[in-house]
């Protein structure tokens, strides 16, 4: 890994004085200086320094600035600051959903949600209607016996019903968890069976790419394999009747009932998100009502600069943390856009059309989509009215320099471009958007407030201007409270704290520049990350190796220099098998059916074998490093593998590919 340049270039974009003055983070800094001793001068760098040095005071200020309603007061901000195990706002009780629906009191007839399908015609839902539906469904969940701590699951696309179900679950103190309906049954069960849901919200199918996709057989399999279910709720997106024994959605949201918000401890679970499952079952990551509330208020209200006048559109699905992040836009009183459809239907410019028709002020997408638009010769600034868009944000992978230039040239010059980076693990950003700072090509603007983000070398020494491991040295409120089914905390500890005890190590290569920006170089582990969605290699192995022709397989994901992502599947065939067009088609079909279209590899390549550790584990990271151009002797410890000749094969393959 080479050292990244840190000399600041001329900014691609610089906010003008008026924009800096009216930004929420500027007003917050002035208020915090008056009330909490924050530095009045020095702009964002001084505020960030104060936020990590005076961590408790900073988070107290966030709670006060956003008027967080504690139904019982907290004893102190941070009872225990050790990682893992930080104890935030002990003694406090509150409810996330109550805060998400607060705008209904003052602006009942304004738009809370804009639902957009592949017709690209927005359908509004007011704050009053959203609150009413949440109140009705919450009462029905209580009638079904859902109690605080019970898990409620959704097999749903990005539709208003999913938001209502999440908020109603949070209102009663339940724990929400969701998967997108393009997940196959096995992928869903690997997640939901861990948390044992008592209610399952499902659709009969969904529309994507101009086609209807019937999921009733998958839903039937989920019902059969989830014995803890007390109720299944049918949402007829394709117009089919509810199957036997299922409740109909319309009847559950028909009442005019004021929501009752269960007041739960700050650390009470809000939802379960899932890791990719690279080394087995996905990790079931539990985040708290209070932790998500204050972290998302900070991130969306200060960093993204969202408020009641804004419209927030991020292309996502319910299987990605960005959906949860998107829903939290409601906390700031913002109108949230829910786009349920293909990112490229009927053409590559689809997302820009949605941004235009919804009047989006902050539009978020993947870096891969930006680069696809550039390659497809899309001209969003010419072909769409994007005058409302203040910021285009990207995540999922680092936005390449050409992506910055393309957005600047093809949307407009006065455009805030926010490349952001975080993780499912915290459901937030470690670094990214700051409305008062300049944007430099290829760089994230700065580390987030309250986040002591550093780059460490292997010895644990902080480095500037050099590539190192992304670490966070102080606790964040949205860090997991625990993993599900991890009673001694060992899996949680090993995931983040094994390399540097007491310090969060995330698994990204980064450079922190001497002007405070951040450059992301990609994953330092082998997690697959395609279009912003982290996926597990274990899921792919399980599906592919059911085919009798496949002896073993290996899948690798590589970030390309041009911003692309190459995901080859290497297959070691059974004796007598041939990798012909028929077998390739069956491999692809198996992956599509059992997992999702996103899991389908870019290439399927026959290999003489799959290398392993001495304990029999497939070697992924060394193969990835070989494909990235790392010499064999630096990519792997020769004494730790079962067949060094196999690794020489992959090294030769990499050399051939590079030409």
Which positions does each model-derived feature cover?
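Adenylate-forming
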Residues: 157, 199-218, 239, 340-344, ...
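Conserved AMP-binding/adenylation subdomain of ANL enzymes
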Residues: 293-311, 321-361, 376-377
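AMP-binding/adenylate-forming catalytic core of the ANL superfamily
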Residues: 154, 179-204, 219, 344, ...
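Conserved AMP-binding/adenylate-forming
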Residues: 302, 339, 390-517, 523-527, ...
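AMP-binding/adenylate-forming catalytic domain of the ANL superfamily
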Residues: 234, 593-618, 631-657
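Conserved AMP-binding/adenylate-forming core of the ANL superfamily
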Residues: 46-50, 97, 113-167, 184-189, ...
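Conserved pre-ATP/AMP-binding loop-to-beta segment of ANL
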Residues: 109-111, 234, 245-274, 281, ...
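Structural core segment of the AMP-binding/adenylate-forming
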Residues: 167, 171-251, 358, 366-367
């Amino acid at each position: 890994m080479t050292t990244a340049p840190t000399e600041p270039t001329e900014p691609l974009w610089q906010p003008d004085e008026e924009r800096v003055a009216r930004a929420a983070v500027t007003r917050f800094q002035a208020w915090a200086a008056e009330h909490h001793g924050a530095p009045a001068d020095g702009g964002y760098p001084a505020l960030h320094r104060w936020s990590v040095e005076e961590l408790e005071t900073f988070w107290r200020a966030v709670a006060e600035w956003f008027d967080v309603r504690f139904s019982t007061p907290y004893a102190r901000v941070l009872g225990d600051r050790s990682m893992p195990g930080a104890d935030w706002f002990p003694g406090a009780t509150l409810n996330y959903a109550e805060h998400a629906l607060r705008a209904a009191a003052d602006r009942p007839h304004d738009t809370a949600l804009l639902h957009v399908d592949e017709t690209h015609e927005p359908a509004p839902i007011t704050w009053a209607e959203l609150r009413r539906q949440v109140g009705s469904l919450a009462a029905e969940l209580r009638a079904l016996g859902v109690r605080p701590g019970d898990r409620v699951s959704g097999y749903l696309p990005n539709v208003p019903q999913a938001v209502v179900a999440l908020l109603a679950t949070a209102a009663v103190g339940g724990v929400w968890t969701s998967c997108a309906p393009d997940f196959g049954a096995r992928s869903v069960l690997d997640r939901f069976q861990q948390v044992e849901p008592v209610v399952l919200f499902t659709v009969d199918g969904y529309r994507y790419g101009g086609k209807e996709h019937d999921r009733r057989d998958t839903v039937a399999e989920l019902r059969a394999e989830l014995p803890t279910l007390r109720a299944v709720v049918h949402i007829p997106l394709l117009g089919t009747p509810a199957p036997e024994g299922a409740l109909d959605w319309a009847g559950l949201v028909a009442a005019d009932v004021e929501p009752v918000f269960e007041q739960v401890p700050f650390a009470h679970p809000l939802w379960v998100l899932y890791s990719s499952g690279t080394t087995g079952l996905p990790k079931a990551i539990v985040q708290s009502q209070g932790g998500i509330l204050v972290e998302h208020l900070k991130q969306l209200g200060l960093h993204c600069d969202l408020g009641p006048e804004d419209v927030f559109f991020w292309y996502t699905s319910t299987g990605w943390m960005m959906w949860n992040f998107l829903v939290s836009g409601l906390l700031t009183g913002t109108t949230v856009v829910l786009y349920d459809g293909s990112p490229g239907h009927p053409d590559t410019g689809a997302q820009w059309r949605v941004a235009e028709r919804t009047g989006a002020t902050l539009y978020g997408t993947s870096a891969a989509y930006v680069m696809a638009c550039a390659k497809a010769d899309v001209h969003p600034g010419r072909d769409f009215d994007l005058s409302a868009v203040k910021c285009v944000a990207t995540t999922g992978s680092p936005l390449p320099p050409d992506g910055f230039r393309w957005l600047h040239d093809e949307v407009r010059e006065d455009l805030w471009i926010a490349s952001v980076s975080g993780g499912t693990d915290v459901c937030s950003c470690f670094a990214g958007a700051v409305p008062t700072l300049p944007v430099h090509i290829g760089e994230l603007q700065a580390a987030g407030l309250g986040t002591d983000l550093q780059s460490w070398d292997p010895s644990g020494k902080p480095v500037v201007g050099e590539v190192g491991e992304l670490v966070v040295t102080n606790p964040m409120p949205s860090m997991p409270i625990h993993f599900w089914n991890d009673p001694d905390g060992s899996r949680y500890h090993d995931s983040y704290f094994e390399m540097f005890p007491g310090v969060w190590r995330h698994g990204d290569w980064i450079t922190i520049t001497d002007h405070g920006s951040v450059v992301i170089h990609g994953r330092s582990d082998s997690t697959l990350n395609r279009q912003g969605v982290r996926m597990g290699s274990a899921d792919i192995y399980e599906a592919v190796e059911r085919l009798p022709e496949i002896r073993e397989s290996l899948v690798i994901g590589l970030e390309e220099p041009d911003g692309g992502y190459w995901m080859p599947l290497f297959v070691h065939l059974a004796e007598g098998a041939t990798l012909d067009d028929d077998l390739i088609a069956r491999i692809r079909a198996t992956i599509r059916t059992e997992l999702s279209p996103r899991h389908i590899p870019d290439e399927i390549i026959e290999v003489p074998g799959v290398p392993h550790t001495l304990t029999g584990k497939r070697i992924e990271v060394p193969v990835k490093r070989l494909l990235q151009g790392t010499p064999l002797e630096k990519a792997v410890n020769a004494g730790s593998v079962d067949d060094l000749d196999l690794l020489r094969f992959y090294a030769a393959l990499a050399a051939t590919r590079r030409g």
